[in-house]
Amino acid sequence: MFLSPGEGPATEGGGLGPGEEAPKKKHRRNRTTFTTYQLHQLERAFEASHYPDVYSREELAAKVHLPEVRVQVWFQNRRAKWRRQERLESGSGAVAAPRLPEAPALPFARPPAMSLPLEPWLGPGPPAVPGLPRLLGPGPGLQASFGPHAFAPTFADGFALEEASLRLLAKEHAQALDRAWPPA
């Protein structure tokens, strides 16, 4: 038996026929990573209303520099989390919302004899070269925009879990440096 082009099992069962294109892969959006400031503002808005209207969502989206659809999806996910917490509380008889354990602030101050010298362009003081910004810490413009506590750890709010783990890694690294280079 002879098959002409376009006939046979390859095209009958879902293969490509003449003039058809291969289906394009569905684009998958990357996960949104929210800043501490964005999460704080979103949580504050959630405390005020679990179902904000479009105008409120658009206003909030502009405030935190996110698309409105991201804010909308955040509220959907947050409501699901809230319902899940409510179910857990009613099932266990607990009254308070589950919280992450408070992590202690880790001390990073070293005694003066053990401190490592910093290059002048890295430190928190005025720039060594005028017109060149500092590399560590938020600048005064950001502090003024977001308020004095916007960049502080917010352990009570539960948003700084990642920050706490980074601090722990930094502490371990500092201890490793102390072991590697004992003070002179």
From Swiss-Prot:
Main location: nucleus
Classification via PROSITE patterns: HOMEOBOX_1 (PS00027), HOMEOBOX_2 (PS50071)
Oligomeric and partner information: Interacts with CRX.
SUPFAM superfamilies recorded: Homeodomain-like
Compartmental location: Nucleus
Keyword Isomerase annotated: no
Effect of residue 49 to P: In RP95; uncertain significance
Function of the molecule: May be involved in modulating the expression of photoreceptor specific genes. Binds to the Ret-1 and Bat-1 element within the rhodopsin promoter.
InterPro entries: HD, Homeobox_CS, Homeodomain-like_sf, RAX/RAX2
Highest taxon of source: Eukaryota
Disease: Macular degeneration, age-related, 6: A form of age-related macular degeneration, a multifactorial eye disease and the most common cause of irreversible vision loss in the developed world. In most patients, the disease is manifest as ophthalmoscopically visible yellowish accumulations of protein and lipid that lie beneath the retinal pigment epithelium and within an elastin-containing structure known as Bruch membrane. Cone-rod dystrophy 11: An inherited retinal dystrophy characterized by retinal pigment deposits visible on fundus examination, predominantly in the macular region, and initial loss of cone photoreceptors followed by rod degeneration. This leads to decreased visual acuity and sensitivity in the central visual field, followed by loss of peripheral vision. Severe loss of vision occurs earlier than in retinitis pigmentosa, due to cone photoreceptors degenerating at a higher rate than rod photoreceptors.
Span list, region Disordered: 1-33
Leader sequence residues: none
Domain commentary: The Homeobox transactivates the Ret-1 element in the presence of CRX and NRL.
Biased composition (Low complexity): 1-10
GO terms under cellular component: chromatin; nucleus
BP term (GO), one: regulation of transcription by RNA polymerase II
Keywords: Age-related macular degeneration, Cone-rod dystrophy, Disease variant, DNA-binding, Homeobox, Nucleus, Retinitis pigmentosa, Sensory transduction, Transcription, Transcription regulation, Vision
GO function term, MF aspect, one: RNA polymerase II cis-regulatory region sequence-specific DNA binding
Record feature DNA-binding region, as residue ranges: 27-86
Name of the protein in its database record: Retina and anterior neural fold homeobox protein 2
